[in-house]
């Protein structure tokens, strides 16, 4: 019998299955790995996913990450961060905001506050992918990709 996850990965890597929202897929893979208490999760790479992963690392939500150049697009290995005592993950919630069917944009004056400033919003701006606080400091708005807290 075939493992359906392995078959799906092979088809995705061969570009035989088209994903309508790769960012939602990325966030879902992270959520599933957190729920299953996995230490490492491997996801197909893209430039946008690399930038989101970099922000998650810089803000302390993940332990480490590594880009692996294998195949046509490569993969990202993300080491999830857990509390040593309680075994609780640093990421409480990953929420996709802007979707391909419903884009959400914000100006720098109307920047969303995630959990009263305790979380972050990740935005795609004209100057690259950055957090809500960085975008407000640069006085630029953009597409709200996701909330993390």
What are these regions (language model features)?
Residues 2-149:
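Core subunits and conserved enzymes of cellular information-processing
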């Amino acid at each position: 019998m075939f493992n359906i996850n392995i078959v799906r990965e092979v088809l995705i890597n061969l570009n035989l299955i088209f994903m309508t929202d790769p960012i939602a897929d990325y966030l879902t893979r992270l959520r599933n790995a957190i729920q299953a208490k996995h230490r490492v999760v491997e996801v197909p790479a893209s430039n946008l996913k690399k930038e989101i992963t970099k922000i998650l690392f810089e803000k302390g939500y993940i332990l480490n990450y590594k880009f692996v150049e294998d195949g046509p697009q490569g993969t990202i290995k993300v080491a999830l961060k857990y509390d040593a005592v309680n075994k609780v993950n640093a990421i409480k919630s990953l929420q996709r905001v802007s979707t391909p069917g419903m884009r959400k944009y914000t100006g720098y004056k109307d920047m969303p506050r995630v959990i009263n400033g305790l979380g972050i919003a990740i935005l795609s701006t004209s100057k690259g992918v950055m957090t809500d606080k960085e975008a407000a400091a640069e006085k630029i708005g953009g597409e709200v990709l996701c909330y993390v807290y």
